[in-house]
Every structure is written in C-alpha cells, then in structure tokens.
C-alpha cells in the first residue's frame, strides 16, 4: 500500500488557523451561528477549530454540536456488516441560525446530503455552510461545494485521502493512500 503525505503537522496547523480566521471574518461573534461536526471524522476537526476560535481568537459562546449521519446515507445498506451509529449531540435550536457543517474530506457529496437531511429533524436554519479540510474536487456525485476549503486535492478514485489527528491517531497529518 503506497502512501504520500499531503500535509504535515505544521502545514495542517497553518491551514486550521486560516480556516479559523475565515470563520471569524464571516461570522464575527458567532451569536447567530452554530458549528456542527459531522460524525465521525469531522468532529475532531470541529473540536479543534472551536477550541482555536475560543482560545486563540477570543470567540465566546460558540454553540457546537455533533451530527451522526449513519442512517441518513443512501448507501448504508450496502455493507456486509451492521453499522454502528455515533452520537448526535445538538443541544441548541438551529431554527433561523447559520449552520456551519464541518467535515474532514469532501469526496462524492453523499455525506453532506445525508447531513442536510438529518439536520431537518432539528429545525430550519437560515443558512448552511460547509467547511472541509480536504476537497476532492473532481469526484463529486452531487452538486455540493464547500464554502471553506483547507486544501483542494486532485486524486483518482483508486486513491483515498486519510486525515490523522493526534487526539486519535498519534499525529496530525494527511496522506493520499492507494487502495488495494
């Protein structure tokens, strides 16, 4: 299995700071904005960004939640083993709020479509934006585009982009891995 490093820990840190600054620029005090990390891997990115916004940029009172999309996906019955759902924790109303979905990799767009469907159970937001660390821009099945992009990556379908977070995987890095 061949792998190529796309982002080092240092590069990832620079990108996270840029994304945090873009969020501040567009949402200022976050009073009418909520941040929702998409389970499972978008949650780690969302937690990191919320912490950075609060501790390094002085944003206060950011409303943050997590959304599990397991049973909202259109491909959830295709696997051979039973699926295990993650936690959904949205302890606030999304009605008339600006929602920023956060996920690690945007590939086909199916996860985001599922997140939009799942979000309907929590109310009708004023606006929904999408922040992704990696945008695999030429692989979309659905017309979904991110509002905030850490890095755009051109990868063929037999390659996988994998994001590693030190909280879970011992280091912060992003690799392009050839599927076998």
Q: Where do the PLM segments sit?
A:
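Active-site-facing substrate-recognition patch
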Residues: 1-32
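Alpha-helical structural signal in soluble globular domains
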Residues: 20, 48-56, 118
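Charged, well-structured alpha/beta interaction segments
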Residues: 30-51, 109
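Residues at the starts of beta-strands that form the adenosine-phosphate
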Residues: 32, 63, 98, 127-130
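Short, glycine/charge-rich flexible loops or terminal/linker lids adjacent to PRPP-binding catalytic cores
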Residues: 59-98
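Internal catalytic-core helix/loop-beta-alpha segment
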Residues: 90-120
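PRPP-dependent phosphoribosyltransferase catalytic core
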Residues: 117-180
